[in-house]
Amino acid sequence: MAAARRLRTLQSQPENKVCVDCSQKNPQWASISYGIFMCLECSGKHRGLGVHISFVRSVTMDSWSEIQIKKMDAGGNERLNNFLAQYGISKETDIISKYNSNAASVYRDRIQALAEGRQWRDPPIVKESVGGGLMNKKPPLSQGGGRDSGNGGWDNWDNDDSFRSTDMRRNQSAGDFRSSGGRGAPAKSKSSEDIYSRSQLEASAANKESFFAKRMAENESKPEGLPPSQGGKYVGFGSSPGPAPRSNQQSGGGDVFSVMSEGFGRLSLVAASAANVVQTGTMEFTSKVKEGGLDQTVSETVNVVASKTTEIGQRTWGIMKGVMAIASQKVEEFTKEEASTWNQQNKTEGNGYYQNSGIGNKTANSSFGGSQSSSSGHNNSYRNSNSWDDWGEENNSKKEAAPKVSTSNDDDDGGWAGWDDNDAKDDDFYYQPASDKKSVGHNGKSDTAWTGGGFL
């Protein structure tokens, strides 16, 4: 903030409100090398001079150091113009000529010394002619005769009067010269066929070739590794390529690429040789086979092997086909037998059930003389519940023991009393209350038999 404030203070001074090199007001750029303020257009020209001549900064957009602020304090637009005026350089002088002058160099040294706090004493003033300096100097015009260095009028190439008859070029013709005040003015863009003979052109070409050959020989004699400004060799367009570095080893090379290329070349040679050998061997073997009749024997052997293979394959397929047919037949027979066995068992059990039911009814009728329909109906229900437990046993009714006779007088509990008294006779009795709510006992044949695993 302090640097910006000091810059605004310097910028607000009357002599700094106008550009140092032109009349543009309110400059926003500065050259630290001289401590001056300038406009945008002039700052671009100062940048073209280089930072060693003029170091340009923006007043508002760039950061400033303390030494740079001190340089701006030591300088000023009016001070610079007054200093350069002592050397004969005005404000309107071209920027390139002005700041490349000796006076500008002295002023830069002065600003640097004052900013660093060193003592400074101005050197003696020597007037400079910027217009006659190196930047604006022009070669003198040719004044005719022998005082001219023979430049051929190239300083005034667009002026036909500047040419003399002695300065003929290859694009001029001798017949197109006209006399004017003792000097001839050639016409432009003319052919040179009438100026030089063929022998002269050939001699000129030979001289040109010898000249360039001499130059190339001189270039070859120069050392390598040095720039041309220090006496080194020129390398570029028109130069012969430098010799490739050769390795001291004869069998290989230090360069990886050369080794790889050499290896691939050798590999290709080996592959080509191997291919030739294989081709030659194949041709020899073929010729020998044909000469000895081996080709016919080989073909016969191949035919025999093929026929045997086909026969074996057909036999194997026939065997497998027969095995599959037998297996399918066996599976079908087993399925049919299982189905017939299942149907026969169901039919046998049904017949035995109805026989037992009939026997039970007859016994009940002979014993009690009544309640036939009730007893028969309940026997059917009981048989249906027990028929699935012994479906695998045939003629179960024929193998059962003789029934036991028992009566029951329990009218209220329907035979459920005493079911847990472990009485063996409970296993052979079946109690069924009558339709008129009277308990009826019968000596029916039992359809179940007790085993260790339960009822069957």
Curated annotation (Swiss-Prot):
Composition bias type Basic and acidic residues, residue spans: 161-170
Residues recorded with modification Phosphoserine: 173, 191
Pfam families: ArfGap
Biased composition (Polar residues): 340-364
Subcellular location field: Golgi apparatus
Key words, A-Z: ER-Golgi transport, Golgi apparatus, GTPase activation, Metal-binding, Phosphoprotein, Transport, Zinc, Zinc-finger
Activation/inhibition comment: Activated by binding to phosphatidic acid.
Compositionally biased spans, kind Acidic residues: 409-426
Top-level taxon in the UniProt lineage: Eukaryota
GO biological process: vesicle-mediated transport
Keyword ATP-binding: no
Zinc finger (C4-type): 19-42
Region described as Disordered: 122-200, 216-257, 337-456
Additional information: Plants overexpressing AGD7 show a relocation of proteins from the Golgi complex to the endoplasmic reticulum.
Functional description taken from the UniProt entry: GTPase-activating protein (GAP) for ADP ribosylation factor (ARF). Involved in protein trafficking by controlling ARF1 activity; may participate in COPI vesicle formation at the Golgi complex.
Protein name per Swiss-Prot or TrEMBL: ADP-ribosylation factor GTPase-activating protein AGD7
Species: Arabidopsis thaliana (Mouse-ear cress)
Lineage per the UniProt record: Eukaryota, Viridiplantae, Streptophyta, Embryophyta, Tracheophyta
Recorded name of the encoding gene: AGD7
